[in-house]
Amino acid sequence: MKKKKILVRSVLVLVALAALCACAWCVWYIVQYYQGQAFGDRMRTNISDDGGSFQLGRVKIPVDFDELQTMNPDIYAWIKIPDTDISYAVLQRGAEDDQEYYSKHSENGAYYSGGSIFSQSYNRKDFSDPMTVLYGHNLRNGRMFAQLNGFSDAEVFESHRYIYVYLPDRMLVYEIFAAYPHSNEHLLLCHDFSDAEDFAAYFDDVLARKSLQSNVREDAWPQPSDHILTLSTCYRGDNHQRYLVQGKLVAEAYAK
């Protein structure tokens, strides 16, 4: 009987310790998550919608990349679409790492089902590729890339013409030329955008497949020499489709 009591007590102690550890982990996770959110929100308040008058050729970079990269060295850029809530750090893992890591982790690296805005190692971090793709979830709370689906509305599309990307040493300005639903194929693995014919064929197909959910600016249509930025998110909860918003590089301003 005495041995049985000792065994029961031991089990209860182990259960209590496990519960305590679980609670401690939950508290740590919540603190890490909200610290990351607060940090990102603070950064967002410093970034204006006017792009820092990029036409002048020199801009003050409104993002403190030193502080961001101290928090997480995977942060390498910041994306903003004026007059929307899209204003986030951009992250990328190394070539040997899980390329979907930031689909389930926040900007500070804490686990978060809403993820972050991220690219994959198929792209260079200087946005010099013919096609750069950034991914983000379509969250019900409107965060990340949820507002991209709104570009299916013609008025929204016409009133939002530019995407800003900030790097530590410069700012890139992209003119939005298309927004449309697309299959969930991996663009960078299924197409060679460095090949002029493949590039032209892809975008010819985009024009040919215009639908009620698509909007395009044919006067701003890209050429094979252009650098394209694609923003990709889930299309209205359909895991088999993505909604893409695409822009071409039209201006580049270096830091003051």
Question: Which sequence ranges carry the predicted segments?
Answer:
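Hydrophobic membrane-insertion alpha-helices, especially the h-region
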Residues: 10-28
